[in-house]
Structure formats: structure tokens, C-alpha cells
A protein has these predicted regions:
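Short, charged recognition helix plus adjacent turn
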Residues: 17, 22, 106-129, 134-137, ...
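Conserved hydrophobic/aromatic packing and binding residues within compact polymer-binding modules
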Residues: 50, 64-65, 75-78, 105, ...
Length: 166
């Protein structure tokens, strides 16, 4: 609003609007992506979920990497298809940053790892009332490999998980 009093002009705002401008840096890419997926629950790939949340927060990959303390190239690989394993500590930081439960970011395989692969393998073996040796023979793997899985010394590969536990 503008008013003139004794040849002196005074200006005062009628309304002050304050809102964050959240627009992704690559607007067209984000627009196409958001048309494909309107909600992260529709996605099965972790890469898509990470990209969706990053676009929602209008961040660059390098900004996300800086916030969670990893190399930008590492984070770029997280958003590429074909990656099987995502370190839990990085996913926990991302979940905290986006204020979502970590389970909503993970796929079935990474949830298997997150919920203690060793315990799950042991429970499945014990539910079938098998010894480690018998269970290893059933799966067609060495006894040492099964022991390492059960004690969380070695991470089971996704291809193995799909073959035996999916």
C-alpha cells in the first residue's frame, strides 16, 4: 500500500508471504519422474525411492551426499539401477534426513539384511528342525558358508537370497 502524506510517500506491505521455493534443479527430469510415480510406495527400486525423496526436498545429489557424509559419486551410484546392496548406516542417515522410516526406503533384500540375516536364517533352519550341516546340504552350500551367514560374518548375496529365501 502506498500513501502520500505532506508530500512524503510511505510504503507498507499489505501481506508478507513466506514460503520455501522447492523446485528441483533439473525441473523437466523431476517432472517426468513425478508423473511416473506420485507416491514412493508405488516404487520397488531403492534408486527410485531415493530420487523421489531427493526431488521432493529439491536437493542435488552432491548436497545429499554432503549431508550424510559420503562421496558424491557414491551417492550417484545409489540412484543408479542394478545396485543390490545399500549400507544400512547410510540408509539410516537418509531416512533421518527425509524424516521417513528406514523400512520405507529399503527393498525386500535390504530389509532381510536390516532385520538380521543371521537370525532369520537360523530361525528358518530351526523351524525345519535341521542341524547346520543338514540345512547346508539342503541349500547346496558349504557348512562354513552357512555358519558365516548365521553369525553375520558374511553378507548373503542378493542372487542367493532370491534363490533360497524369497
Amino acid at each position: 500500500m502506498i500513501r502520500n502524506i505532506s508530500y512524503k510517500i510511505e510504503v507498507s506491505p499489505l501481506i508478507i508471504l513466506h514460503f520455501p521455493l522447492l523446485a528441483p534443479r533439473k525441473f523437466l527430469d523431476a517432472q517426468i519422474f513425478n508423473l511416473r510415480f506420485s507416491d514412493p510406495s508405488e516404487m520397488t527400486q531403492i534408486a527410485d525411492k531415493l530420487r523421489w525423496y531427493r526431488y521432493r526436498h529439491a536437493l542435488l545429489q552432491s548436497e545429499v551426499a554432503g549431508r550424510i557424509g559420503i562421496d558424491p559419486k557414491t551417492y550417484m551410484r545409489y540412484e543408479e539401477y542394478g545396485r543390490d546392496y545399500y549400507p544400512i548406516e547410510h540408509m539410516q542417515k537418509l531416512a533421518g534426513m527425509y524424516v521417513v522410516p528406514i523400512e520405507s526406503l529399503l527393498d525386500d533384500y535390504n530389509l532381510f539384511l536390516y532385520h538380521d540375516q543371521g537370525r532369520q536364517i537360523r530361525e528358518r533352519r530351526l523351524s525345519q528342525k535341521l542341524t547346520q550341516k543338514a540345512y547346508a546340504a539342503n541349500l547346496g552350500v558349504s557348512l562354513d558358508k552357512l555358519k558365516n551367514w548365521e553369525e553375520n560374518r558374511v553378507r548373503m548375496f542378493k542372487s542367493t537370497w532370491e534363490k533360497y529365501f524369497r
